Swiss-Prot record:
Keywords: Amino-acid biosynthesis, Branched-chain amino acid biosynthesis, Cytoplasm, Leucine biosynthesis, Magnesium, Manganese, Metal-binding, NAD, Oxidoreductase. This is 3-isopropylmalate dehydrogenase. The keyword Phosphoprotein does not apply. It comes from Brucella abortus (strain 2308). HAMAP family: LeuB_type1. Gene3D superfamilies: Isopropylmalate Dehydrogenase. GO terms for cellular component: cytosol. The keyword Oxidoreductase applies. InterPro entries: IsoCit/isopropylmalate_DH_CS (IPR019818), IsoPropMal-DH-like_dom (IPR024084), Isopropylmalate_DH (IPR004429). Pathway: Amino-acid biosynthesis; L-leucine biosynthesis; L-leucine from 3-methyl-2-oxobutanoate: step 3/4. Substrate binds at R97, R107, R135, D226. The gene is leuB.
Amino acid sequence: MASRKLLLLPGDGIGPEAMAEVRKVIAFLNSDLNLGFETEEGLVGGCAYDAHGQAISDADMEKALAADSVLFGAVGGPKWDSVPYEVRPEAGLLRLRKDMQLYANLRPAICYPALAHSSSLKPEVIEGLDILILRELTGGVYFGEPKEIIDLGNGQKRGIDTQVYDTYEIERIADVAFELARTRRNKVTSMEKRNVMKSGVLWNQGVTARHKEKHADVQLEHMLADAGGMQLVRWPKQFDVILTDNLFGDLLSDVAAMLTGSLGMLPSASLGAADSKTGKRKALYEPVHGSAPDIAGKGIANPIAMIASLAMCLRYSFGLVAEADRLEAAIAGVLDDGIRTADIWSEGNTKVGTTEMGDAILAKFKALSA
């Protein structure tokens, strides 16, 4: 049996505590299900700066490039607020994305039935929500040149950011969207601002052409991004996969995540190009939440987003769909049982710590895997 190579990068703050619960699940996948995961560990973020003077070492970057997949915790904290900009903790994540050439960011928005009341929307609008926002991660206005502030010499300044997309960038992210839709409900909604932006016109043309050329079996609709934001709040369950650029994806994915009322419980994935020989994509999985230094080391952090990130990893990097389904069902089942960490606790539920939540999910996963 071929081994499955995983690099674990716990990072800073609550990252190590959450990753400890993931290790338990991986141990079970190996010992009881014989799935052959090989794990290595490395440093990223502030802890890497403390050890090496940089946010990720070249050696750990090599481990990331050699792995089938990377599981990332969280980085940052006030301890490193004054370090030089180029070695700040967040630079470790940026280097991982850049060197691994991760251009497709997947942000699911899932409403767990037991937490439907946590949303600011009516339960009938949000209950059963399961959508996926696919954001182009390496192009667009965040990376386009020129990017500068110019002194106009008359007491005025001008800030310049440039939105740039090439056809190949649009085509490759569109391919990912259609591939993902086939594994879900077979629908892609592409969002841009073609009415006022030339890059939006090209985006629309590129997605349409790619659909006609390679993916005509998938339903495709186009929507202006501002209208898409409105529809996300009005009736989010109309969507399956939302495909959009870097800027709009940044905005819309946070809107979609908060629909669920549980931003800190959601996972994400960043994927790269498919290998020409194996078809596998480089991938990094991480919780949406930050490092939460204020609660680090207290044993009260919620590990659900980190465990859900492992479920995404099983699904998208290793094709272990049944195992991913069971792990996600285990999370939902524990929530149905009223087990809560402090961040999602309410009257009438059972408050537990990080370890207890991880143990409960693992026990449920074991029962579902029997």
